[in-house]
Design a protein with these regions (language model features):
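Structured alpha/beta or helical-core interaction and ligand-binding surfaces enriched in interleaved
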Residues: 1-164, 169-195
């Protein structure tokens, strides 16, 4: 049975699926750990690789660990997260390939974010778990690599292949915070280099 409450809930859910586009200047003013080339990141910041630490071969189980990690990191950062997402540069062939493998909900999120807003740059504020889960799935499935910038507890993480995500920190205390969070979700930060 359909009622007004469901209609309202659907409307609220829909609105929360739109990322907020920000300018490159806004991004630069808010984000401390940023660089154009990943090699610069490795040279300038303490870093490590976020990887699965369990013994389960199921991709879905592994992906769930990353989704849980990123959602808890979002909470830890009080919803203060920026991502880069090059959605306006997607060619039709690439978009079709991505849409083929997404479930309906993720397809709608992607299409809505391509069509329903003015895009100021490649940077977007992300402040809810549905969107964080969506971005995580794009990364883990190697469909679209997004960099995720956490602001409250500064850390930057690059989307990457083979469920191995480079993480960058300014200071060992941030490394320990995220390392503890990773362990909680059957992940680990490996290959740590301190600067």
């Amino acid at each position: 049975m359909y009622n007004n409450h469901n209609k309202l809930s659907e409307g609220v859910l829909f609105l929360s699926q739109i990322l907020k586009s920000i300018s490159e200047d806004e991004f630069k003013n808010k984000i401390k750990i940023r660089f154009n080339n990943i090699l610069d990141g490795f040279d300038r910041y303490s870093n490590g690789l976020l990887e699965y630490n369990g013994d389960n071969d199921s991709f879905k189980i592994k992906e769930g660990c990353f989704i849980n990690f990123f959602n808890e990191a979002l909470e830890l950062n009080k919803g203060k997260v920026i991502i880069d997402l090059y959605i306006k540069k997607l060619e039709n062939e690439s978009l079709a390939r991505i849409l083929e493998v997404l479930d309906e909900r993720d397809k709608n999120i992607l299409i809505d974010n391509i069509n329903k807003q003015e895009i100021k740059s490649v940077y977007f504020e992300l402040n809810n778990k549905d969107l964080m889960s969506f971005i995580t799935r794009l990364n883990t499935r190697e469909l679209f690599f997004c960099t995720i910038y956490f602001m409250e507890k500064p850390m930057t993480i690059w989307g990457n292949y083979n469920l191995s995500f480079p993480m960058f920190f300014e200071g060992n205390n941030m490394l320990e915070i995220y390392r503890d969070l990773a362990k909680k979700h059957n992940l680990d930060v490996r290959g740590i280099v301190l600067k």
